Amino acid sequence: MAAKKQSKSAKALRTTVRYEDVAVSFTQEEWEYLTSTQKTLYQKVMSETFKNLTFVESKKKPQEPNPNLKDKDDDKSSTCTGVFKGGPFFFCLTCGKCFKKNTFLFNHQFPVRSRRLAVTKPQSRKALGHKPQHRGDRPFFCNLCGKTYRDASGLSRHRRAHVGYRPRSCPECGKCFRDQSEVNRHLKVHQNKKPVAGSHVKVHQNKPVASNQKQKGRVPPTTRESPAPALRHLKVIQGPVARAKARSSRASSLEVRSTSVTVARPREKVYCPYCRITFTMRTCLLNHLKIHFRRQPNQHFCCKESHSSNTLRMQKIYNCPVCDSSFRGKESLLNHLCSRRPIRLSKCWEILGHLLGYLREPLGNIFKVRESRKRRRKRISSDSSETEGPSGSDEVMEVDTDSDLS
């Protein structure tokens, strides 16, 4: 009996101690209740325990070598870099887990693969079974599209896309942007542009020009007094032999078409009887109706049921949250938000700005400002017409008096 007890005690001593047995783990709710000093103390204690475990593992006795597993041991020794020598640990401040490398902590906080699967394959098991870690890191979300952000500045910048608010403008071309970073990115386009050559042609009479190096220039524009050249838009090549090249008749015909005034005909909008999406062309409506005919009548209209990328692209819809009008493109939705309708006095983006709390002025003040501006314009136009009227009548009276005297 004593021998059996000794064998049991020896087995109990030989059992390995894991990190999970020694470590103390807190739940998310318990971790939130801890103070900053308690969190730092917990990190220090856990780092010390981890170092002690690695030290004990390095001091273990080596096992007896097995001749059958020599090759495998050699491969392991070549791949293994050694025992962790102890260094700075990386702790997650939200759940308290520690990691050896910063990359492990980053993958723990921001799992990239699950996000890609959720976008590319939304019905896959990995994407459906995945639960996003640390939701508290992105508490700010948009009520319209559901996008989440870490801080309020990112959410306000995203709201400008819905409202169409672009306060920053380019000093070179006058284009408007949402923030200064987009303006700085746009200014690089102006910096990379090469300076346009002048209209005059520089002729180097003294310097000889090689046959392989040809300098190109343009003929100076003609004035009213100077005679016009025989060919339009000559392209002169300076060198040992001067040649003139005229552009083809096709290019000139294209110029005439571009300069001619085109009258835009109003197109009748056609809407889908199933989902009430409006289209300007009937062919687009017919292509859209194929999606409804493919599916069964009891199924709902959803992007998940389509099988190809073209059908997904056609089913992508942008809805206006104010007037419930749907569009296929993002630009058309922004144009609709910024345009003013004759039925409504205000634009859709103004109403949306008040709903989101972006514009602080009430709609009544905006209407008053518009009415005052209209009245001022009417007064200015009436004053200008009155000033022009009496001057014209005086001239007529003077002409009549001159005719009477004659």
From Swiss-Prot:
Top-level division of the source organism's lineage: Eukaryota
InterPro entries membership: KRAB, KRAB_dom_sf, Znf_C2H2-type, Znf_C2H2_sf, Znf_C2H2_type
A Pfam family per the record: KRAB
Stretches the record annotates as Disordered: 57-77, 194-226, 372-406
Main location: nucleus
Summary of the tissues where the protein is detected: Expressed in oligodendrocytes and at lower levels in astrocytes.
GO cellular component: heterochromatin; nucleus
Amino acid composition bias (Acidic residues), ranges on this chain: 395-406
SUPFAM superfamilies: beta-beta-alpha zinc fingers, KRAB domain (Kruppel-associated box)
Listed transmembrane segments: none
Gene3D superfamilies, sorted: 6.10.140.140, Classic Zinc Finger
First and last residue of the signal peptide: none
Site (Crucial for 5-methylcytosine recognition) location in chain: R178
Keywords: Developmental protein, DNA-binding, Metal-binding, Nucleus, Repeat, Repressor, Transcription, Transcription regulation, Zinc, Zinc-finger
Record-level GO BP terms: autosome genomic imprinting; epigenetic programing of female pronucleus; epigenetic programming in the zygotic pronuclei; genomic imprinting; negative regulation of gene expression via chromosomal CpG island methylation; negative regulation of transcription by RNA polymerase II
Zinc finger (C2H2-type): 90-113, 140-162, 168-190, 270-292, 318-337
Location in the cell: Nucleus
Residue ranges of domain KRAB in the record: 17-88
Molecular function as annotated in GO: chromatin binding; DNA binding; double-stranded methylated DNA binding; zinc ion binding
Domain notes: The KRAB domain is required for function as transcriptional repressor. Zinc fingers 2 and 3 mediate recognition of the target element, ZF2 interacting with the 5' half (TGC) and ZF3 interacting with the 3' half (CGC).
Recorded family membership: Belongs to the krueppel C2H2-type zinc-finger protein family.
Record function comment: Transcription regulator required to maintain maternal and paternal gene imprinting, a process by which gene expression is restricted in a parent of origin-specific manner by epigenetic modification of genomic DNA and chromatin, including DNA methylation. Acts by controlling DNA methylation during the earliest multicellular stages of development at multiple imprinting control regions (ICRs). Acts together with ZNF445. Required for the establishment of maternal methylation imprints at SNRPN locus. Acts as a transcriptional repressor in Schwann cells.
Protein known as: Zinc finger protein 57
Biological source species: Rattus norvegicus (Rat)
